[in-house]
Structure formats: C-alpha cells, structure tokens
Design a protein with these regions (language model features):
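Hydrophobic/small residue at the entry helix of a nucleotide-binding pocket
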Residues: 231
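RNA-binding accessory domains that recognize and position tRNA/RNA substrates
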Residues: 30-222, 238-278, 288, 310
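Class I SAM-dependent methyltransferase "Motif I" SAM/SAH-binding loop
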Residues: 226
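ATP-dependent adenylate-handling ligase core
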Residues: 249-387, 391, 403
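Short helix-capping/linker segments at secondary-structure and domain boundaries
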Residues: 143-155, 306-314, 421-432, 478-483
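ATP/NTP-dependent adenylation/nucleotidyl-transfer catalytic domains that generate, transfer
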Residues: 44-101, 106, 355, 359, ...
Length: 526
C-alpha cells in the first residue's frame, strides 16, 4: 500500500506520493483535514511529517495560528498595508455598476450588470439605490480584502456609523472564519472598520434622514433568489401558492438555473458579476485565497436589483440548518461555512437595510422556520422539477460548471441530497434523479459519516445539521427499502444513529424569523 506524506514549511506545503511524485501544491492552505480527505478518497494510509513543527502542527496537538494585527507591521511579504474602498459608479444607460478597490496602489474593478433596468424616476428611490450600491461596495469588498489582509482599512467617503461598522466587522470576521481556519490565520485583532459619521449627501442631494422620511411605494411583489437546487424551488412555489407575485433572479451564468426557472414557466432576470482580473493575478502570485460569504454579496446585489426593478421583497431560501457551526477551531471559536445564510446575518443585514437604505424594502429568508428535511419532503412531491434540479455545487462556479452532468456523485452536497431525499423516495426514484445509488457504494461511507458527525469533521459545504443527518439515516435504517444498502448497514452500527431523534418535518413559525407580517398572512391563508 502506498503512503501519503507531506512536508510542511513556512509559506508552502508540498504533497508527495511515495516521497518522489508530486501530486499537487498548496500556498499556505494545506491542513490535516485536507490530507485526511485526500487519503480517504484514494484509500491511502496517512503519514505526515513536518520540516518546521513551529509553523504547523496536526489537530489535537497545538495548532499555532499566524496572528495578524492592525498594530503590527506586515508579515511574510504577503500582507498589504492599506485596503481602500475607492468608489463606485452606476451607468443607468447600460445598467452597469463598477465597484473600485485599491490594495497598496493596485486598482481592482468589479463590474455588476443589471439587464434591461429601468431607471427609477422617483428621487427617493434613486437615492435608496445609491445607498444600496454603497452597501454592495462595502460587502463585495470582502473578496478583495482577503487577498492582502491589509493592516488598515480605508472606507473613503462611505458613510460608516457605529451600526454599519459593527455589521461590517462581524461580516468580515465571521464571513472569513473558514478562510482563516484553512489558512491558519487569526484575524480577530486585524479587521477594524472605523466609524465615519459624516452623512455625505447622495447624488440626489438628500441626506440619509431625508431619504428615510420618504416612502418608496414599492409594490408588494417578491424578487426571489434562485440557486438551481431544491430550496429555492420550494421557496418560489410557496410564494406562488400564497398568491405573491414573484420574479426569479440569479447572479451568474448558470445554465442549470435557467432550466429550472423555465420549468416553472417564469422569466429569469440574470445579473452578471465580473470579478476583477487583477484578483486572479494576485491569487496566481501567491495572495491569500479561500472561501468568502457569497450569499452576503448576492444579497447586496439583489437589494440593488429590487430597487431598480421595483420589488418590495428580496427573498432567499436559507433554512434553520444554516445556523449550525461547521466546526470549532483550535481556539474554540465557531466556524460556520454558511454564516451568510444564517439567521444572525439575515437579521444584521435586514437591520442595516432599514437604517441605511430604506424601511420600505424588506430582506428575508422564507424557509428560515424549516429544517432541511422539511424542505426536502416538500420538494419530493414536486416531481416536475426532479429531472432538472441539482444541489451539486460543481455546477455553480464563477467560471462555469466543472462537470458535464447534473451530479458529480461524489461530494458532500450530492451525498446530503441523497440522504435527505431517501426517506421520501424509493431507491429507483432517487437513482433516476442522481444517476447513481450513493447509499449503496462502499467508497461513500466515509463521506456519509462526516455528514452525521461520526468521527469526521462536518464538511465545509451547505449541508444539513448533524442532528437531522443522523435522524434521516435512522429513518433509512428502519426502512425496508433502504436498510440493506451498504452505507446504511455500516452507519446502523453507530449508537449515535440508533439514539438519533425524529425527522423535523413541520416548519416552526414560532421560532425567530424575519418573514414580514403581510407575507405570513398570505402563507397562512394558502
């Protein structure tokens, strides 16, 4: 049996097969979980050696973090001195917004294009849009800030009061928690958005107080974020059943999202986001890279879209499971891959909109009272979408899909979709959807154990909670259709599965959520 070994040293890790054949290289991103996953997939025993144990140690010993602090000098030649929010611009003639940033003199321009956008004639709505665009500029900056992790953040002419500073500090710290964990960084003493209470007039000449005193008179219809998976389709159908006028919208060019919306017999607004090419060059040159809270960025984009197109409600399909932390790092700090899908972010973002943009446009997740399995149960009955949807994230990348089919059949998202759907479908029906029986494949057992929190880290993916994964597996253990499948038989031996709770199939509308009263009234009447 071959061995996998790794040599770690400051700045770079190099994996070698049999100590002579290079498999891949990582720039400050190689961690023990990565190695464990690689070894598991390739059925290899794991042996790790360290050239400099003071830089990196395996989990369970002592995990040193590279501490970045705003009061310290730049470290390692990779850290920037200043990250600036240089400005933003919108051209009503083309529907193109430009967001400009500066990293130590390096200019980065991001472009957002809103198709066939009518420019609002109402001055208050124009002002609200520019406030929303300013918020988008601040939120989207996280994609560029992470590359240099600058000691100083210069917000330029942006309006930063204490509530906005608190929102941004939490978003950048929590939204980059996974990025920091993977790169072994401590950002707690680094990120600091300073208060700037100067209420600079926006382009209409109105102050913030003037803006908030004028109602926008937006129609009570919903702009619904679409992701191509089951959650957004359930959300869309619930609103339609409740008699709410809906408009599906997505960010990016995914063909699959277009197909799911077409199946719903609705038009799709497709907003394009073009990242700065300079960021790619920086990443190629060894800049820090990793996960960013994309849902936060898309939320800000759709807020702008709601004001341009005239929608009172900006609706996402984030469920209660997104509140669960993925893991705790070596310092006991929670790391949530889904932070920007969590209730905490939803509440913070809604409060910022009300205070800094307008109380007349409302942002919320319709599915917050639902567990993942409760959503899946509803979707299992929406058979018309079974042949067109996909939950596999390899379909949805900034640079396009990375698979030819709808399902890669070997990732946490594919596995969780199988686990969540199986209690409500026959093996043949699930095979028809995914093109494989993942629950009957020996090489999938380790991945399903991770979903259930059985001796493995929960994956850094948008999957259900450990409790509901265990409850779903327990359901399969007791189901004659599924109990003889290989993975089900293996996991049935674990006491955690035997002791799991029941599937939570009903929404809990008594729990905290942000669904507006007017929408709740329609839902209750449907």
């Amino acid at each position: 049996m071959s061995h996998l070994s790794a040599r770690m040293y400051a700045g770079r890790g190099h994996i070698k097969w049999n100590n002579d054949f290079p498999i891949t290289n990582y720039a400050n991103q190689l961690t023990i979980p990565h190695l464990r996953t690689f070894a598991t997939v390739h059925h290899l025993p794991l042996r790790v050696t360290f050239q400099n144990p003071t830089i990196f140690r395996p989990r369970g010993v002592t995990e040193p973090y590279l501490i970045l602090n705003k009061n310290s000098a730049p470290v390692s030649g990779r850290q920037a001195t200043c990250f600036s929010f240089s400005g933003y611009h919108y051209d009503p003639a083309t529907g193109e917004a430009t967001l400009t940033y500066n990293v130590d003199g390096r200019i980065l321009n991001e472009k957002i294009t809103f198709p066939w956008t009518p420019w609002p004639v109402d001055a208050s709505r124009q002002a609200a849009f520019f406030r929303a665009l300013e918020l988008l500029h601040l939120v989207a900056g996280i994609s560029y800030y992470k590359a240099g992790l600058a000691i100083r953040i210069d917000t330029g002419n942006s309006n930063i009061d204490s509530s906005m500073a608190e929102f941004l500090n939490e978003l950048y710290l929590e939204g980059l928690a996974e990025f920091a964990y993977v790169n072994k960084l401590d950002l707690t003493g680094l990120i600091d958005f300073e208060v700037n209470t100067d209420d600079t007039p926006v382009s209409t000449g109105q102050s913030l107080d003037d803006l908030l005193s004028h109602p926008l008179d937006l129609p009570g219809r919903a702009l619904v974020a679409m992701g191509g998976g089951k959650d957004s389709l359930v959300c869309l159908q619930m609103l339609r059943d409740a008699g709410v006028e809906v408009q599906p919208v997505c960010v990016g060019g995914s063909r699959l999202i277009g197909e799911t919306v077409k199946k719903a017999n609705l038009p799709l607004i497709r907003i394009q986001r073009e990242l700065s090419g300079e960021l790619t060059e920086m990443n190629t040159g060894g800049a820090w890279n990793g996960h960013v809270p994309v849902t936060a960025i898309n939320s800000a984009i759709l807020l702008c879209a709601g004001l341009l197109y005239g929608y009172r409600y900006v609706v996402f399909a984030n469920e209660s499971s997104a509140n669960e932390a993925t893991l705790k790092d070596g310092r006991g700090r929670e790391v949530n891959h889904q932070y920007s899908k969590s209730l905490a972010f939803e509440q913070n973002f809604a409060a910022v909109i009300e205070r800094h943009v307008s109380p007349d446009i409302e942002y919320f997740s319709l599915l917050r009272p639902f567990s993942e399995v409760a959503i899946t149960r509803r979707f299992s009955e929406m058979t018309e979408f079974h042949e067109v949807f996909s939950s596999c994230n390899r379909n949805f990348h900034q640079d396009g899909p990375r698979i030819t089919g709808r399902w890669c059949q070997d990732c946490p998202k594919c596995r969780f979709a199988a686990l969540a759907l199986a209690p409500f479908l026959s093996p043949q029906a699930l095979f028809t959807i995914q093109g494989a029986d993942l629950l009957d494949q020996e090489n999938q057992a380790q991945g399903f154990k991770a979903l259930c929190g059985l001796g493995e880290f929960k994956p850094f993916e948008c999957v259900g909670s450990i409790a509901e994964s265990r409850a779903a597996m327990k359901c399969l253990v007791n189901d004659p259709q599924w109990q003889d499948k290989y993975v089900v038989r293996v996991l049935a031996r674990y006491p955690e599965i035997e002791q799991a709770g029941v599937l939570e199939l009903q929404p809990d509308f008594e729990a905290t959520h942000c669904i507006p009263a007017a929408v709740m009234t329609r839902l209750n009447a449907s």
